[in-house]
Amino acid sequence: MSTTKALSLLVFILFVSLVHSSDQCPINSIYQFGDSISDTGNLIRNGPASSPTPKPLPQREHNVFVNFGVSGSTALNSSFFSERNLHVPATNTPLSMQLAWFKGHLRSTCHGSSSDCLKHSLFMVGEIGGNDYNYGFFQGKPMEEIRSYIPHVVGAITAAAREVIRAGAVNVVVPGNFPVGCFPIYLTSFPVKDTKDYDDNGCLTHLNEFAMDHNNQLQEAIASLRKEFPDVAIVYGDYYNAFQYVLRSERFDKSVALKSCCGTGGAYNYDGKRPYGAVGVPVCQNPHKFISWDGVHLTQKAYRFMSKFLNNQILSQIKCTRA
């Protein structure tokens, strides 16, 4: 776990918006669970050369950012994948472990009731779950088998949200999945010959439909959570439509909308055998034109535009507690 001034850019921009609205709705801390979308160094810190259970870094007196997200992590425990003959890396830090870190952090820093400590906090439970499906897709599992994972993944995410609520959280954002059929890594790895299998933006329809299936089931689970905890603001983070908003924006170069900024080769400037950071792979010189940074993650500009879409949605639903 790392405590840092900047989580993902997406979360950081959201925090700035909350600070600016602090007169109406004071938020003094953000707790982030997730994967590489939010990881700012936990994978390295939690690697073979480090302690397997990192200790919390000291908090600042105000405006606390605590990030439990680890690159490559899953919503489900590793045993789920081993039972299905899927390999996941030893560094996998599933939601259950991230929650254990959170509980340890809370015990070491909260000297009153956890409800009092968390009443001015915002919890981001995700984005997570994409890797649960990735391990199936990229290890050759059929679509219908991977689709059967969705209820399990959604169950793990909602169980995590339930745990932080029981700990005292009153503002919880649960993001959905991206339209992964628009990402260079998927467009390159799973090409199809029939142009009817691509939408008007050039994205793979069947993969976007899969993401929507996950998102629909997640929203149904969130609706149930709201009935279970009527006094808690549980907000669905619509990353799918936030990305589509970016894709439609005139502020990006349409000719490279589906291409990786840092990469090489192929129609989407992405080669899984020579990813960003590999020897000979050029660094992008004009990231302001691109949506995708490395074929998997987005550019800072894209995240900034996503945040514009998300901020009003989230800010209008969070629970304000001044006492």
Curated annotation (Swiss-Prot):
Protein species of origin: Arabidopsis thaliana (Mouse-ear cress)
Catalytic activity, EC: 3.1.1.-
Lineage: Eukaryota, Viridiplantae, Streptophyta, Embryophyta, Tracheophyta
GO terms assigned for molecular function: hydrolase activity, acting on ester bonds
Pfam family, one: Lipase_GDSL
UniProt keyword annotations, A-Z: Glycoprotein, Hydrolase, Lipid degradation, Lipid metabolism, Secreted, Signal
Similarity comment: family membership: Belongs to the 'GDSL' lipolytic enzyme family.
GO biological process entries: lipid catabolic process
Keyword Lipid metabolism assigned: yes
Subcellular location(s) per record: Secreted
Signal peptide coordinates: 1-21
Protein name: GDSL esterase/lipase At5g03980
Gene3D superfamilies: SGNH hydrolase
Class in the EC hierarchy, top level: hydrolase
Sugar attachment sites: N77
Tree of life domain: Eukaryota
PANTHER family: ACETYLAJMALAN ESTERASE-LIKE, ZINC FINGER FYVE DOMAIN CONTAINING PROTEIN
Coiled-coil boundaries: none
Annotated GO CC locations: extracellular region
Active site location: S36 (nucleophile), D294, H297
InterPro entries: GDSL, SGNH_hydro_sf
Keyword Glycoprotein carried by entry: yes
